[in-house]
């Protein structure tokens, strides 16, 4: 298929730069713009060297070019604080917004759990939750699709070197958004999320712990089978997603211990937390793009809200 859907990325930091590398390999997506606010940023320089158009004037520098350059999908890898305004401007021009910040103004999307239902929903903004959410929510969902989960708790441990300034400013949003998605997408009645930023040298690979309390005695065989099935689904787009231990059963508690190794596109392989986020965003965009190219999905501009 030679035809591709054109994309723009807002935020040339760790996540935006890693995502750009993944989009360049995509059979259905073509990145054409990288948007930043600092003309001297490494991310913008790198994008220019790759032949990508750049602007250091923020999203307003992109808007006049969207129609001419045929941009239909925009990724926001900036901060929760500016996302709503970015999304509004992009949606008004008829482009789909894929949100990699914890802003969560659109529906949560965790590809192996609920991506299919978003494709026909007419949503013009989908939120990729957080790196911790992408790594752990599939496992909560794997348990909850077998039997009711009263409580789900996730702990994401990431290397300090892989956590950029945007993520550090959004720690509270990270925990709130992830906990909310553990409930809404994972299916737990109550969710909790904890992030640990580890300064150890050499840097540690991303590790995730998932605890689920089931309402009834856990069906160990069915839950184990469900977890391994879900593991295989995530590995389709994140090959370094591994089950280190578990599921471990202790009364009604089901525990799963995971490790996520990145592909090493931009950041080293220990930054699996960024890799799972960018891989999930690319996978989501590809599914939307395939529908658009097949004529099954047409994007429509979102009318501005009257003041």
From Swiss-Prot:
Keywords: Aromatic hydrocarbons catabolism, NAD, Oxidoreductase
A biological-process GO annotation: catabolic process
Sample GO molecular function, one term: acetaldehyde dehydrogenase (acetylating) activity
Binding residues for NAD(+): 162-170, 273
EC numbers: 1.2.1.10
EC top class named in words: oxidoreductase
Active-site feature positions: 131
Reactions catalysed, as given in the entry: acetaldehyde + NAD(+) + CoA = acetyl-CoA + NADH + H(+)
Claim: NAD is one of the keywords in the record: yes
InterPro entries assigned: Acetaldehyde_dehydrogenase, Acetylaldehyde_DH_C, NAD(P)-bd_dom_sf, Semialdehyde_DH_NAD-bd
Family named by the database record: Belongs to the acetaldehyde dehydrogenase family.
Name the UniProt record assigns to this protein: Acetaldehyde dehydrogenase 2
Source organism: Comamonas testosteroni (Pseudomonas testosteroni)
Gene: aphF
């Amino acid at each position: 298929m030679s035809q591709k859907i054109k994309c723009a990325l807002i935020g040339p930091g760790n996540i935006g730069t890693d995502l750009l590398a993944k989009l360049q390999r995509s059979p259905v997506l073509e990145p054409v713009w990288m948007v930043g606010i600092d003309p001297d940023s490494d991310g913008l320089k790198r994008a220019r060297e790759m032949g990508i158009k750049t602007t250091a004037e923020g999203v307003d520098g992109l808007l006049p070019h969207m129609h001419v350059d045929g941009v239909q999908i925009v990724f926001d890898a900036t901060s929760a604080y500016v996302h709503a305004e970015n999304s509004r401007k992009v949606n008004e021009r008829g482009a789909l917004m894929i949100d990699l910040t914890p802003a969560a103004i659109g529906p949560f999307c965790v590809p192996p759990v609920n991506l299919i239902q978003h494709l026909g929903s007419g949503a013009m903004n989908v939120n990729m939750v957080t790196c911790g959410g992408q790594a752990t929510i599939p496992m909560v969902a794997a348990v909850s699709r077998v039997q009711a989960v009263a409580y789900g708790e996730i702990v994401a441990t990431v290397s300090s070197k892989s956590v950029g300034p945007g993520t550090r400013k959004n720690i509270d949003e990270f925990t709130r958004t992830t906990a909310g998605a553990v409930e809404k997408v994972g299916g737990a009645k109550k969710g909790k999320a904890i992030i640990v930023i580890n300064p150890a040298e050499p840097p540690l690979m991303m590790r995730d712990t998932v605890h689920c309390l089931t309402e009834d005695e856990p069906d160990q065989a069915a839950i184990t089978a469900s977890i391994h099935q879900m593991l295989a689904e995530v590995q389709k787009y994140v090959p370094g997603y591994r089950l280190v231990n578990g599921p471990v059963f202790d009364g009604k508690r089901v525990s799963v211990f995971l490790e996520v190794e990145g592909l090493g596109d931009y950041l080293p392989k220990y930054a699996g937390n960024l890799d799972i986020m960018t891989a999930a965003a690319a996978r989501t965009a590809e599914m939307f793009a395939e529908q658009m190219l097949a004529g099954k999905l047409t994007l429509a501009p979102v009318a501005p809200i009257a003041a």
